[in-house]
A protein has these predicted regions:
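Conserved beta-strand hairpin/beta-sheet module of binuclear metal-dependent hydrolase folds
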Residues: 7-36, 130-140
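Short, glycine/acidic-enriched loop or turn micro-motifs at the edges of active sites
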Residues: 24, 50, 73, 123, ...
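Surface-exposed alpha-helical segments enriched in charged/polar residues
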Residues: 31-34, 61, 163-170, 209
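Metallo-beta-lactamase
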Residues: 82-86, 115-202
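Active-site HxH/HxHxD metal-binding segment of metal-dependent hydrolases
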Residues: 25-110, 195-199
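Residue-level detector of beta-strand structural context in well-folded domains
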Residues: 7-8, 101, 106-107, 129, ...
């Protein structure tokens, strides 16, 4: 079962849970986790911007949980410029300098019996990913309801994002999509109403090999 923690998702297996992204309010996050009788074991980060990693240091200090991030975004955990804290003039945050587990698309992340496939989706950042667990996708700042993440900031790339959206458009099934911001949606709804994902789907049609006669 799933428990909503702010705009992030807490995935439960037995009484353990994994937090997908950790915005800067550890007291609220822990309060929500404790109210559901859960124990935080791991944090999976979709990318390394401050509004997704701000509570990591405090949560690790208070729970001993493990931290996972894509290898390309690991440097952002300790780089104020890379995490955009300088750009948005964020003050008083704690950088996380402890142990980090890095992954790539070749890895499967686990919490007890739950398995999370990693879909590399660079564009918003070079190390942006989506996590897929069963029929649920946690899309970070790659895919939103009717929109997508910005690419006009350092380490962003509109070309890379379009390629990532093509990967998402090519996924099978009507996944429930939990974005890093805005409302929960579904992959079918985004295929129909999201102009960026529709463009990506059109690109797939033009780039797919023609069937042989």
């Amino acid at each position: 079962s799933c428990s909503l923690v702010g705009s992030e998702m807490c995935i439960r297996d037995r009484n353990n849970c994994v937090l997908i992204d950790a915005p800067a309010d550890p007291d609220y996050i822990l309060g929500e986790i404790e109210s559901h009788g859960l124990t935080l074991k791991k944090i999976f980060l979709t990318h390394g911007h401050f509004d997704h990693i701000g509570a990591v240091a405090d949560l690790v200090d208070r729970t001993g949980c493990e931290v996972y991030i894509h290898i390309m975004d690991k440097p952002k955990l300790t780089d104020d410029a890379g995490m955009l804290a300088n750009l948005f003039r964020i003050r008083g945050h704690r950088n996380y300098t402890g142990k980090v587990n890095v992954f790539t698309e070749d890895d499967i992340l686990k919490l007890d019996e739950l398995e999370f496939d990693v879909l590399e989706t660079p564009g918003h950042t070079s190390g942006s990913v989506c996590f897929i667990c069963g029929m649920n996708m946690f899309s970070g700042d790659t895919l939103f309801s009717r929109s997508v993440g910005r690419t006009d900031m350092p380490d962003g790339s509109s070309t890379a994002l379009m390629k990532s959206l093509m990967k998402i458009a090519d996924l099978g099934g009507n996944l429930t999509v939990y974005p890093g911001h805005m409302n929960v949606t579904t992959l079918d709804a985004e295929r129909k109403y999201n102009p960026y994902l529709r463009q990506a789907a059109d690109c797939l049609l033009y780039t797919s090999p023609s069937p042989r006669d």
